[in-house]
A protein has these predicted regions:
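Sec-dependent N-terminal signal peptides
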Residues: 5-13
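Bacterial signal peptide processing site
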Residues: 20-22
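N-terminal alpha-helical interaction modules that lie
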Residues: 25-83, 89, 147-190
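Short helix-capping/linker turns of helical repeat alpha-solenoids
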Residues: 60-69, 94-104, 112, 135-144, ...
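Short coil/turn linking the two alpha-helices of tandem helical-hairpin repeats
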Residues: 75-83, 106-120, 151-158, 190-197, ...
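Alpha-helical repeat scaffolds
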Residues: 85-90, 119-134, 167-173, 202-206, ...
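Terminal, low-structured helical/coil segments at or just beyond the last alpha-helical repeat
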Residues: 141-163, 237-250
Length: 250
């Protein structure tokens, strides 16, 4: 009798455990679907990130030193985000006089110009731009970048496109397409990022489209983005070195 009761309790326990596991598994799946839905649908995921970068930059303007510059650069942690700091770095080095930012500019340009299909003219102009800075020509990292540029081979069949890791799948697709030279994706990305401070990060993609793919409208975008940034942040006249960068695309 006791044996039968124990067997019955054991079977009941196993059934309940199985049901519980199924419920938990189903609930977990629902949670995952909910999370995936939020990541795909929430429109301000990217803009909140950009807004944070903008706040860091405002702090840098008030306190133009290495500490606040590095705090801003820490927001550009991932490799695909690295070169998007290009405009911030141009201003930090040229307008705010932060020397360490000059190497960062060189690194941003290095990420794009290391692609083997870059035009010879653009490569020469960029080398000339980098060599204006003693900190780039004397610094170990700067020397490595310049050597990379000078040894760059021209082979249009070996395009290297960085992996994009953005939270927004739509933004990810458009950025990847722009890096591959898709005019359609570039236009959509430009429209998507033109409303608020997100436009700052378009400079890298405008630069890629103008420099690597010789897309004429992107050349105008480079100049427009820089002018808008200086105007909206009350930075005054564009400095000589940043103007030299813009002159590459006139």
């Amino acid at each position: 009798m006791k044996r039968n009761i124990l067997i019955g309790l054991l079977l009941l326990s196993l059934q309940q455990t199985g049901c519980t596991n199924n419920v938990q598994q189903n609930k977990s799946n629902e949670d995952n679907r909910s999370t995936e839905f939020n990541i795909d649908k929430v429109a301000n995921i990217d803009s909140s990130y950009y807004h944070l970068c903008s706040e860091k930059f405002e702090s840098l303007i008030k306190h133009p030193d290495d500490k606040h510059f590095h705090e801003l650069m820490n927001e550009f942690y991932y490799a695909d985000e690295y070169s998007e700091s290009l405009l911030y770095c141009l201003v930090a080095s040229n307008k705010l006089g932060i020397d360490v930012a000059k190497i960062r500019v060189a690194s941003c340009l290095s990420e794009s110009l290391s692609n083997p299909n870059v035009g010879q003219n653009s490569k020469d102009l960029s080398l000339s731009y980098l060599k204006k800075w003693a900190s780039c020509t004397k610094h170990k990292r700067g020397k490595q970048i310049i050597e990379r540029f000078e040894s760059l081979t021209m082979n249009e069949n070996q395009i290297r496109v960085p992996t994009i890791t953005y939270k927004s799948s739509e933004t990810q697709r458009l950025k990847a397409g722009s890096l591959k030279g898709s005019v359609e994706d570039y236009k959509k990305l430009k429209e998507k990022m033109s409303n608020d401070e997100m436009y700052v990060f378009m400079l890298y993609y405008a630069y890629i489209m103008a420099d690597r793919y010789a897309y004429s409208p992107a050349k105008k975008d480079v100049i427009t983005i820089v002018n808008r940034f200086y105007r909206e942040h009350n930075l005054g006249p564009i400095d000589k070195d940043t103007q030299s960068f813009c002159n590459l695309f006139e």
